[in-house]
Amino acid sequence: MNARPVFPVELLERDRWIRRSVDKVPLQVSGRNASSTASQTWSSYAAASSSSVGTGLGFVLNGDGIVCVDLDHCLGESSVVADWAREIVGQIPGTFVEVSPSGDGLHIWGRSSFQGGRRFTVDGGGVEIYSTARYLTMTGRKFEGSTDVLADLDEFVEWLLELAL
């Protein structure tokens, strides 16, 4: 039996929810294409979560201080953290962290003054940081030790960006 998705109130209160296709195409609750830069294509959580369009949910980042760090392919069997990601996961402050739809990645959500997007590798592993004009798939499947709040990630993001140098 699947656990009910859990999302921080700070995300639930924002009308920036969309649906997504199996291929991660952003969709409106009507089934038409959504856009990460066109707010009229976004919905409330209630509307998006009750829609049967597509295969899941997404949340749009619009530069208002919400940031997501995406660690690609960092989880192995039984959610064992890959060597390349172990130090990163150990540095995560008490914030909302969810397992990605693939089951082998993590989305680290929080607040930050970071603007834009950045993609880089750390010891061969993929790291992405986004705060605007982007949507991320959402599962609500909390990773071990995750909280239900969005913490300040400024220091964490700064530390990650130093790893990218």
Please identify what each model-predicted range represents.
Residues 1-165:
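Conserved phosphate/metal-binding and DNA-contacting active-site motifs used
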